[in-house]
């Protein structure tokens, strides 16, 4: 059980989105401009990075906490801070 819990803590969810660009910057979902290579924290527990592809399109990648089933005897414990420290962890009773 302990190994399973530790494995889950290292899994993340990632996305890549083609985004509007102006003057060589990515525009995020809140309308804020970001330079290529810049990383920023999302509204929730997530992290984003702006990049430009070989074809000249601007994208940002987003990485967030995984969602997974929690065994009935366990629960999710909320965390704070920047990604990935803010991702919840699974807490189970000692065996």
UniProtKB/Swiss-Prot annotation:
A GO-annotated cellular component: extracellular region
Cellular compartments annotated: Secreted
Keyword Acetylation carried by entry: no
Main localization of the protein described in the UniProt heading: secreted
Gene Ontology terms, MF aspect: toxin activity
Keywords, ordered alphabetically: Disulfide bond, Secreted, Signal, Toxin
Tissues expressing the protein: Expressed by the venom gland.
Residues of the signal peptide: 1-16
InterPro entries assigned to the protein according to its UniProt record, in alphabetical order: SVWC_dom
Superkingdom of origin: Eukaryota
The record's account of how the chain is modified after translation: Contains 4 disulfide bonds.
Family assignment from sequence similarity: Belongs to the scoloptoxin-16 family.
Identification of the protein by name: U-scoloptoxin(16)-Er12a
């Amino acid at each position: 059980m302990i190994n399973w819990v530790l494995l889950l803590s290292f899994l993340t969810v990632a996305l890549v989105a083609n985004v509007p660009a102006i003057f060589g910057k990515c525009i995020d979902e809140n309308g804020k401009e970001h330079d290529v290579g810049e990383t920023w924290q999302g509204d929730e527990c997530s992290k984003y990075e702006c990049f430009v592809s070989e074809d000249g399109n601007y994208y940002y990648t987003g990485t967030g906490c995984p969602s997974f089933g929690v065994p009935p005897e366990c629960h999710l414990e909320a965390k704070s801070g920047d990604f990935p420290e803010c991702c919840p962890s699974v807490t189970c009773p000692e065996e």
